[in-house]
């Protein structure tokens, strides 16, 4: 964290937010484990004191919506002393109940859709936006992350998808809901 903060200061930032990926009910290479949470929060607190007066710092977590049992609205995430929470959908359940990571490069996304969803891109897109909408209904976060992730991968899978009326309607309806709720969408 220290290196990121020093770089932000050197580039003239006046404020900077740090957000790790929140723990999941299973281990991944890219998410924090619960037993590291206290270290994450205390290291941030130390750095906030160290850089006080030089840069305004905020700490957050990017929290995955998987289902009703794992999402940003859960008390275990709400009780954490965070400045902000990002709600995201990185994974979907396949029809067989297997968790499939869809936050992948486009070529791997194609393989995963073909293998786990029988190549039915439309159902994957609908499931993704259904999960995003459910996450928004449940709340518990300040920022929507990766709102365009499906947009990119699905259009690589099927060029021209972005021009299809049903897709445009789905995306517009989704953004209308997050705007009505006062959320900000961040893509990175």
PLM regions with names:
Residues 1-2, 68-72, 122-128:
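Glycine-rich anion/phosphate-binding loops
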Residues 1-67, 77, 151-169, 173-174, ...:
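An N-terminally biased module of ancient metal coordination in phosphate/nucleic-acid-related enzymes
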Residues 75-76, 136:
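Short, well-structured alpha-helical segments in soluble
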């Amino acid at each position: 964290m220290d290196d990121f903060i020093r770089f932000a200061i050197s580039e003239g930032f006046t404020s900077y937010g740090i957000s790790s990926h929140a723990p999941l009910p299973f281990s991944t290479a890219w998410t924090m484990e619960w037993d590291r949470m206290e270290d994450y929060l205390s290291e941030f607190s130390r750095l906030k004191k160290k850089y006080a007066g030089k840069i305004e710092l905020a700490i957050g977590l990017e929290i995955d919506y998987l289902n009703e049992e794992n999402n940003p609205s859960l008390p275990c995430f709400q009780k954490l002393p965070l400045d902000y929470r990002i709600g995201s959908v990185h994974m979907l359940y396949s029809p067989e109940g297997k968790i499939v990571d869809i936050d992948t490069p486009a070529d791997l996304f194609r393989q995963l859709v073909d293998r786990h969803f029988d190549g039915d891109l439309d159902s994957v897109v609908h499931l993704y936006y259904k999960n995003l909408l459910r996450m928004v209904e449940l709340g518990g976060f300040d920022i929507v992350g990766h709102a365009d992730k499906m947009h990119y991968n699905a259009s690589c899978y099927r060029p021209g998808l972005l021009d299809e009326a049903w897709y445009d309607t789905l995306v517009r309806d989704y953004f209308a809901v997050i705007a009505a709720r006062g959320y900000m969408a961040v893509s990175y």
